UniProtKB/Swiss-Prot annotation:
It comes from the Bacteria. This is DNA mismatch repair protein MutL. Keywords: DNA damage, DNA repair. GO terms for cellular component: mismatch repair complex. The keyword DNA damage applies. Pfam families: DNA_mis_repair (PF01119), HATPase_c_3 (PF13589), MutL_C (PF08676). GO terms for molecular function: ATP binding; ATP hydrolysis activity; ATP-dependent DNA damage sensor activity; mismatched DNA binding.
Length: 658
């Protein structure tokens, strides 16, 4: 039987390297974090062969004392902690003393360093666990570490590496995360001798734009809030910027990139009302908290952490993001979709841009002068205006034309004749609506006939509400509205769905339940066994949502009351869908956790359906509701509720100004 024996140090280091250094990107992270801890203000990185053949990191930090340079390559040797209390309050990026020792055990490593008060630098080399004697070398103040031929002495490990291009991509991503977390440090990267990027020390906003991209910059909302000793800040993308990938999700805790389930769950919960299907949000979040409130000593790579009070962190992240997203009302933000981009997606041709004018004021800049309710203080974090050169005539968008058949022409004429036929009732209703909503508008009583131009009766641009006034209903689906300098298209069902949903949520929060209205005659329907079981299990909870159902026996249910807010909705279809939602609530979920999904289902039933003809006052009432409703830029499923076509885009379609 074999005897127990202590493993040699070089073998221990190679085993430890399996946890710390999985690939070149991990080695790069350990070295760069040492440079950050050394107080460097400039860090230069060179990679060869994707980091497999060479990783070279140079910094201008404080350097290593000549007497400590050999010790720096030994296991568990560090200057950052000395006691257990230091470990509990550690604020540095590294503290284990394992990184350099692990890298030195699986590569040919050269360490050169010089402190400011030293006349020359000191250099030491390590290969296969063996250290050379320190020698004098020429080097500016700071440190340079070269790790060559990674895993040269562990061929089995090297076989698990991917291609050089893939390993380089991981290294570049790792360096971008570190650069994003430390914008006050200048970073540069060279790949096989070619400069990839060179970032100067800059502000956080500038660094986010440089790393995450201009598209994120223009579609982001700035956040900054605190809760006691915790502070959360950064930028989150508007819901329409959401993608199917998670490559633009960054969480930093005390400037350390982490993958934390608590924070990610809070982000997901905040976006759940405004994201469509499987899309994921983009964000850059920084959480600062006392070092003793978080345990970073969970995993050797330090990307997994543990909060002392995870509930406090979750609440801060959720409420901060939820408030920022709730403030994306139609009176505060631009359209969630740009009509010019939509035209490009459909036709493949970009409309010719118009020459820029001096008056480039945003459509909603005057919204504060219009009585649409309380405004939020949330602003776009990175506003910018880009100018593009006019397109040549040949490439400008030309609308496709086709003749209508006689049947199509008659159908269209009949539709619009019926919709816009003049009646005294509609004229009186419209004038009353405008008088009630806008006191400064023309009164109901006709003014004496004069020679004053007709345009004098039209509201001035400063009097227009953010979403303007409805002028038509298109195809029974969309509302066409005119604002100050643009036309707006509103999906009436999607908009009404969001308005009803937010009203229901507010009513549930204020009263604890939805107001119900009893039916004069109960409506019965044949139910499945699952629907009957859901009623038996959740009858009281259903009543809280304004639905009163009773079991008539023989798999027959009767609807006796429905939510008053939903009006003339199909109560049977509503009851079936809500029962199905309740049936899906498993033992791991409560009704409260599933509440918003149930309310979203109910609001869909009570919203305007396609094909329903609306009067102008009804259309305008919906627009005003949108201006006062949180998250009204998206419906409950995350789809946009309105788009804008500016005057410049309209002119470009007709080649005006070419």
């Amino acid at each position: 039987m074999s005897r127990i024996a202590a493993l040699p140090d070089h073998l221990v280091n190679q085993i430890a390297a399996g946890e710390v250094v999985e690939r070149p990107a991990n080695a790069l992270k350990e070295i760069v974090e040492n440079s950050i801890d050394a107080g460097a203000t400039a860090i230069d990185v060179e990679l060869a062969g994707g980091g497999i053949r060479l990783i070279r990191v140079s910094d201008n930090g404080g350097g290593i004392h000549p007497d400590d340079i050999e010790l720096a390559l030994h296991r568990h040797a560090t200057s950052k902690i000395k006691t257990l209390n230091d470990l509990e309050h550690v604020a540095s990026m590294g503290f284990r003393g394992e990184g350099l020792a692990s890298i030195a055990s699986v590569s040919r490593l050269t360490l050169t360093s010089r402190q400011e008060d030293s006349s020359h630098a000191t250099q030491v080399k390590a290969e296969d666990g063996k250290l050379s004697s320190p020698t004098a070398a020429a080097h500016p103040v700071g440190t340079t570490i070269e790790a060559a031929e990674l895993f040269f002495n562990t061929p089995a490990r090297r076989k698990f590496l991917k291609s050089e291009a893939t390993e380089y991509a991981h290294c570049a991503t790792m360096l971008e995360r570190l650069a994003l977390a430390h914008p006050h440090i200048a970073f540069s990267l060279k790949r096989d001798g070619k400069q990839v990027f060179k970032l100067p020390a800059q502000s956080l906003h500038e660094r986010i734009a440089a790393i995450v991209g201009d598209d994120f910059q223009t579609a982001s909302l700035e956040i900054d809030s605190d809760n006691g000793a915790l502070r959360l800040y950064g930028a989150i993308a508007k819901p329409t910027f959401a993608k199917g990938k998670t490559d633009k999700q960054y969480c930093f805790v005390n400037h350390r990139f982490v993958r934390d389930k608590v924070m990610l769950h809070a982000v997901k919960q905040a976006y759940r009302d405004v994201l469509h299907n499987a899309l994921t949000p983009a964000f850059v979040l920084f959480l600062d908290l006392p070092p003793e409130a978080v345990d970073v000593n969970v995993h050797p790579t330090k990307t997994e952490i543990r909060f002392r009070d995870s509930q406090q962190v979750h609440q801060l992240v959720f409420h901060t993001l939820n408030k920022a997203l709730a403030d994306t009302r139609a009176d505060l933000t631009e359209s969630v979709s740009n009509a010019g981009e939509v035209l490009h997606d459909i036709t493949g041709v970009t409309p010719a841009p118009m020459p820029s004018e001096n008056n480039s004021e945003n459509l909603f800049d005057r919204a504060s002068n219009y009585p649409t309710g309380n405004k939020s203080d949330t602003h776009n974090a990175f506003g910018s205006s880009g100018k593009t050169a006019p397109m040549p005539y040949q490439s400008a968008y030309a609308p496709q034309q086709r003749s209508l058949s006689l049947r199509e022409s008659r159908a269209a004429m009949n539709t619009y004749a019926e919709l816009y036929k003049k009646t005294d009732d509609i004229d009186l209703e419209l004038s009353r609506f405008e008088q009630a909503r806008f006191g400064n508008m023309p009164s109901e009583t006709p003014a004496p006939q004069t020679d004053t131009p007709l345009s004098d009766g039209i509201p001035s641009p400063s009097e227009l509400p953010p979403l303007g006034f409805a002028i038509a209903q298109l195809l029974g689906i969309y509302i066409l509205a005119q604002a100050e300098d643009s036309l707006l298209l509103i999906d009436m069902h999607a908009a009404a769905e969001r308005v009803n949903y937010e009203k229901m949520k507010r009513q549930r929060q204020e009263n604890g339940n939805l107001q119900s209205q009893r039916l004069l005659i109960p409506v019965t329907f044949a139910a499945s066994h699952e629907e009957c079981a859901a009623l038996a299990d959740h009858a009281e909870a259903l009543a809280g949502f304004g639905l009163e159902l009773s079991d008539m026996g023989g798999n027959t249910l009767a609807v006796r009351a429905a939510p008053a807010m939903l009006g003339k909705s199909d109560v049977v279809s509503l009851a079936r869908d809500v029962l199905n939602e309740f049936a899906q609530v498993g033992s791991s979920q409560t009704i409260e956790e599933h509440e918003n999904h149930i309310l979203a289902t109910m609001s869909c039933h009570g919203s305007i359906r396609a094909g329903r003809r609306l009067t102008l006052p009804e259309m305008n009432a919906l627009l005003r509701d949108m201006e006062n409703t949180p998250r009204s830029n998206q419906c409950n499923h995350g789809r946009p509720t309105w788009v804008k076509l500016t005057l410049k885009e309209l002119d470009a379609l007709f080649l005006r100004g070419q």
